[in-house]
Amino acid sequence: MPITKYKAAAVTSEPGWFDLEAGVVKTIDFINEAGQAECKLVAFPEVWIPGYPYWMWKVTYLQSLPMLKKYRENSLTVDSEEMRRIRRAARDNQIYVSLGFSEIDHATLYLAQVLIGPDGSVVNHRRKIKPTHVEKLVYGDGPGDTFMSVSETDIGRVGQLNCWENMNPFLKALNVSCGEQVHIAAWPVYPGRERQVAPDPATNYADPASDLVTPEYAIETGAWTLAPFQRLSVEGLKKNTPEGVEPETDPSVYNGHARIYRPDGSLVVKPDKDFDGLLFVDIDLNETHLTKVLADFAGHYMRPDLIRLLVDTRRKELITEADPVGTIATYTTRHRLGLDKPLDGEKKEKEATKGRDSEAEEL
């Protein structure tokens, strides 16, 4: 039986720019803060660890190389002690954590998200299906078995998407079909429309993401929608600028874009430009009854006999057997990365405890 009323938080803060350890420490601090505030869920922005490489939108390929090398060196692997520290923080605070991070797997980076449960387990691990525009110079495409978004939890059906995935009608349709009740629309850092230069469309600026795309997601899905955003300081602007290039001096256009929306698309809270921290919301899952009774696109307000979405969640292997009779062992990304293993050997400890109890009974 899910908890229908609880407190949740969205992070709007500056990441530990391209410093893995600093990012992990700051992540744990926010998890602890949300836990102390009695939240059941805390949501972080897209690639919060080690920060969104906004410099890729502004510099040449050659200028980017030293920064890209450092970025790769400070990206996070899911089966690492850094990730286990974050998982322990979730367990210690009995809280769900939606974390966006740059995942390095073998030699490729992915725009990844995990949903960590209050027991420290990884409930869901997903990768952005298609990096946006110049992001393709940094990240790879997520495979078929890592793009599902919605997880069944005791705080409702929780979904996660990265950046422009939140405007993808097919991904929205998929999440609706899964009965999503709470959505994390994780955004990176990018400037407001004050910085718009023709012919660059308004689509490519933060205000439409915050004030159009995100509430539209809430309206169309009828889900509580948390939109965590990264921020920038003057020092952060320097760290996002390669050597030999004059950094920007006004970070204000990058700030104040985080939002939380109700299932009907109405605004719950938005930060001031200079606010850095957690935005809070009191979620009531029963409020979605009021929106779903009007428009449930997974039920009474859809015609699957006319319109259907084809979804393929299989992992496509790099090497396959040419002989259709022969087979090559397959595996899921989740299994290969060790995400189906218990945190800190909890399973072994439980088995040992069970064994000691049996011995005591025999005595």
Swiss-Prot record:
Does this UniProt record's set of keywords contain Transmembrane helix? no
The protein's pH behavior is summarized as:
Optimum pH is 7.5.
Example of a GO MF term: cyanide hydratase activity
Q: Which residues form the active site?
A: E46 (proton acceptor), K128, C163 (nucleophile)
Q: Which InterPro entries match?
A: C-N_Hydrolase, C-N_Hydrolase_sf, CN_hydrolase, Nitrilase/CN_hydratase_CS, Nitrilases_CHs
Q: How does it assemble?
A: Oligomer of dimers, forming left-handed helical fibers.
* Protein name, UniProt field: Cyanide hydratase
Primary gene name: chy
